[in-house]
């Protein structure tokens, strides 16, 4: 399955992450729904996690590890989850293979990809 970056008015869309605020929670509207994301950092394992909540504060996913190039929330999907596919990646051509404190939110962003429904 090929994924296409969502392209509106030639702007590549992504969810902004500010590692200087971690741990923190923010809301974002994706397609027709608003979600809350809580971004945390596990200093021992050196990885980020994201908790996903619906507009009513119900937990959809807890402790999802942010892995470079792997779609978030891909293990369990149903109609409550975001329509776009969210993939942590770098589109600058740099050779990055993991999400780190130094690159997350800067070079590595949570890019939105069009979900192909077949």
What is each model feature region?
Residues 1-16, 116-118:
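Short, intrinsically disordered N-terminal pre-domain segments
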Residues 20-26, 37:
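Short, hydrophobic/aromatic-rich segments at coil-to-beta transitions
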Residues 35-36, 60:
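Short, isolated positions in well-ordered beta-strands
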Residues 41-89:
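Acidic, aromatic-enriched beta-alpha/helix-loop junctions
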Residues 86-99:
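Low-complexity, intrinsically disordered Gly/Pro/Thr-rich segments
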Residues 97-118:
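C-terminal charged interaction modules
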